[in-house]
Amino acid sequence: MTTRTGPQYYPGADHVSYWYEDDFDATAMEVNVACLHTTEGRTVPNYVDSQGRKGASAPNLTAIPDFASRRLRWYQHFRIDSSARALANRYGGVETNTLNVVQAELVGTCDPATHAKWVKAGYQHIYWPEAPDWAKRDLADFLAWLHEEHGVPLSGPSRWPAYPSSYANGAGQRMSATTWPAFKGVCGHMHVPENDHGDPGAIDFPELLALARAALNLPKPTNPPAAAIPAFPGRKHFALGQSNNYVTQLGKQLVKRGYGKYYSVGPGPRWTESDRRAVAAFQRAQTWTGAGADGYPGPETWRRLFS
């Protein structure tokens, strides 16, 4: 297979100060996926592992905000078509870092708790779900360049849940071991199998794609209308002893969203403790607690589950 056919250095990026490809083996690829991370810090990390090796968990590039200039400054660690090291890759599982993916870490946070702490401390930073326009513009320019020079599609997952519900597969957003190898486009760390991290959180992905397409003067894509959310049938259908099609419908959607582990068999029409536990897990993933996570679906649980 032909590899490394496009330009290997992002224009304007510093590929000297934090260059790690000379220190680690890297697989030659032909990228068709871009994966976005957040560093959860305010400086460029050294990406040190437990053995003290700098760059051992580095992506291909890191973007740090320059608040004075209102721009992102880019540091490159590996060539574009070289495998980086920022994704977990379990023994015997699917390929992650080496599966034609270029990775970019965005300095800042996607965690609302960290954001609140830094605001209180007066630390200048980017909370990526609410990134300033200039940061979104520069990130979109990077995606546009990847599309134009490497053919990375300007498309990706529809679900970018907020952290911490995005951690592990709390919001059912993570790709499976079978869907990931076929994926092409832009995704987040939260979407890659064998990984637990929930970054980059609820970034405005549609806006990023729109900005990238505008930078290339591409027409707006025509999207099929979203499927209508089925009407909530009422709480009475989800109680001990109830048996109806709505319970089956609920259970199938829970499995689709990643909560199948709560079912030893099924799901089926009879309301069981398995259904309640699966619903409760989904509710907790919305950061609800107490009565809001009791395992019995109400209108808002239903709406979010089927969104």
Task: Give the residues covered by each predicted segment.
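Glycine-rich, acidic and aromatic/proline-enriched surface loops and short helix-turn segments
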Residues: 100, 105-110, 188, 192, ...
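Active-site-adjacent loop/helix surface patches within enzyme catalytic domains
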Residues: 2-154, 176
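Charged catalytic carboxylate motif
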Residues: 138, 246, 278
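Second-shell loop/turn segments in exported
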Residues: 90-91, 121-134, 234-242, 264-269, ...
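SH3/SH3-like beta-barrel superfamily modules
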Residues: 273-288
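Basic/polar, cationic surfaces and motifs that engage anionic cell-wall
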Residues: 2-11, 109-228, 281-284, 297-307
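Acidic, Ser/Thr/Pro/Gly-enriched interdomain connector segments
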Residues: 217-269, 273-274
